[in-house]
Amino acid sequence: MALIDCSGGEFMEKLASSAATPGGGGAAALAGALAAALGGMVCALTAGKKKYAAVESDIRRLAEQAESLRRELLKCVDADAAAFAPLAAAYAIPKDAPGRAETMERCLRGAAAVPLHIAECCAAVIEMQRELLDKGSALAVSDAASGAALARGALCAAAANVRVNTRLMRDRDCAAALDVRAAALLAEFCPLADRIFEDYYKENTNG
């Protein structure tokens, strides 16, 4: 049974168990998908409203983007588990076995690649929420801010799961390239998510 086909409660039970998967990468992907879904909600509450007719085409474009990101991140929940499976098997290979180091290296690269993709998707979600905060229905801007905050956490979680694999790689050039990409996403999009949330909070103070 695919992880994404589990109920929310079943997924949480698996996540809280001693099972190897789902883990941090899968949780990051699911959180990112939830953030994208919040963007979809903003679009659904804005589309077709006379008050927002001037941005209708933008909202329809953003709705398609939100749906695409949501679907991609949901796929990543199981993709992360699938990438970890061969790594778990590689750990079981005797340390003096021929070819173990090469197998480990290949599996570590694969296990790092998925959370990096998750991080990239979460960055796109954050960028989308910036536009939705500006153009979405006033009744739903809290959902854009919530989506940005949730995607920020998912981005950080995904980056952590890149690092847990790259730190063990022998090919330090490859590891550094992956780490640099993850760090660049954190440096650009965490502050953007913070600004989105702060802008929402400042514009919606009491009095």
Residue ranges: model-predicted function:
Residues 41-53:
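Transmembrane signal-anchor/signal-peptide helices with a preference for the extracytoplasmic
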Residues 125, 140-207:
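Preference for long, well-ordered alpha-helical segments
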Residues 80-149, 153, 158, 165:
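Amphipathic alpha-helical interface segments
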